Design a protein with these regions (language model features):
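Conserved acetyl-CoA-binding loop-helix of GNAT-fold acetyltransferases
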Residues: 77, 83-96
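Short loop/turn motifs at secondary-structure junctions and domain boundaries
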Residues: 39-45
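Conserved GNAT acetyl-CoA-binding A-motif
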Residues: 96-110
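Short amphipathic alpha-helix that is part of the acyltransferase structural core
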Residues: 1-35, 50-52
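Conserved beta-strand in the GNAT
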Residues: 50, 56-64, 69-76
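Conserved catalytic-core motifs of GNAT/GCN5-like acyltransferases
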Residues: 104-106, 121-139
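Conserved active-site tyrosine of GNAT-family acetyltransferases
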Residues: 115, 120
């Protein structure tokens, strides 16, 4: 298994990439995914890393980098390869290769367990929206 910076724009805009990344999107649609990726491609502070296993991409992580800190915009692993440590390896390897001092993320109840397993500390916050409140977590992992 290898984790690499993905610069293949055709793949990033593909339905294969969307099928992996959709699990970390709110109400995912392929059109919305493509629009987000196109925005990221125009932002030099955003990088996309993928996990490749025997030539097949099984996970991806989108990061916004600022000096020695990164914020996870999204991280996802293909359905059939979940719970095998791919997400954790994405975080660890990117932290090493990009020489990061810390990685931040914001998540919900569904994913907080993943971040805990990866060693992130967390702060529980409640966000108020017109249609109700939502519990979110600000997570941080230090080198």
């Amino acid at each position: 298994m290898k984790i690499v910076l993905c610069e293949n724009i055709d793949w990033l805009l593909s339905k294969e990439a969307f099928s992996i990344y959709a699990s970390c999107m709110y109400h995912p649609s392929y059109e919305e995914y493509k629009a987000q990726i196109e925005d990221y491609l125009h932002d030099s502070s955003v990088k996309v890393f993928v996990c490749e296993n025997h030539g097949k991409k099984t996970g991806m992580m989108v990061l916004k980098l600022t000096e020695a800190t990164a914020e996870i915009i999204g991280i996802a692993v293909s359905d059939n390869t979940r719970r095998k440590g791919i997400g954790k390896q994405l975080i660890q390897r990117v932290m090493e290769t990009e020489h990061l001092e810390r990685i931040k993320a914001q998540t919900d109840e569904d994913s907080i367990g993943f971040y805990r397993k990866c060693g992130f500390s967390e702060e529980r916050i409640v966000k108020e929206y017109p249609d109700g409140s939502v519990v979110r977590y600000n997570c941080v992992l230090y080198k």
